[in-house]
Amino acid sequence: MFENFTEEVVDVAGAPTFVRHGGAGPAVVLLHGHPRTSATWHRVAPQLVSAGFTVVCPDLRGYGRSAKPAPTADHSAHSKRAAAADVAGLMTALGHESFDLVGHDRGSYVALRLAMDHPARVRRLALLDCIPISEHLARVNAEFATRWFHWFFFAQSGTPERVITADPDAWYSGDPAVMGQENYDEFRTATRDPAVVRGMLEDYRAGLTVDRALEESDRAAGAMLRMPLLALWSLRDDLEELYGDPLAIWRDWAVDVRGHGIDSGHHMAEEAPSELAAALTEFLSPAS
């Protein structure tokens, strides 16, 4: 897994950040979602290296082997702004002033915040299986609350930690035949770590509070993404079923939007890596 990649922990303003990086050429950052680590990209990253990119895959703060800051009352220590600053600082440390940026699931919210906060650094932005948090919350109904109940369960204080850490393997399921054994082993190690569980829950708590407020402030100010945006979603997940065309939502946030569905379940990097890598390579090529 990640043959010929370097694995290291980089200190980013006091936040230890675990990262895998390899290849040569324009830099592209891949940000994982919940409850995964950077290992989720193990089938996509080598294909992007072969296509001529430097590929950087960090563990987000609170996840995997990266920093586990103490929770704060306002959840700002686990905000997407804080996580985005980690990624921006990591790329500076690795010598990349500008880069392409890809995020999946919770990593998409970090990528969106990074593109909003540091637009000059992001050449192209690809967001997988997401619409903005504030757009989800503006559309909450019984169907969303039933399917995505974990958003609201995770927001509760204390109870989710007790429930999940009592039997993490039951809460977080995975199939090594689909994920790949090494990816699965890393995922299982992470989800059995109470510090990781707390960090992941704080990610969701920040989402409903400080992250939502930042997005709503962006919209009130008329902020728009100016870099090209690719939105991809899993056809066997429920984003399209819940909201129709996700591109219609993203056009309120970005001036240059394109995208399509991919025949996959939610974890497309593991389930449809070649199709995903092809879509990213086409989008990230200089002529796109």
Where are these regions (language model features)?
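Residue-level recognition of oxygen-bearing side chains
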Residues: 15, 36, 275
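Flexible "cap/lid" subdomain of the alpha/beta-hydrolase fold that forms the substrate-access gate
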Residues: 1-8, 15-20, 27, 39-40, ...
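Catalytic histidine-centered segment of alpha/beta-hydrolase-like enzymes
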Residues: 264-273, 277
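Active-site glycine-rich loops that stabilize anionic/oxyanionic intermediates
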Residues: 25, 33-36
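Short amphipathic alpha-helix adjacent to the substrate-entry channel of hydrolases
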Residues: 39-55
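Structural cue for short, hydrophobic secondary-structure segments
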Residues: 30-33, 57
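Short amphipathic alpha-helical segment that frequently serves as the phosphate-/nucleotide-binding helix
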Residues: 35, 247, 277
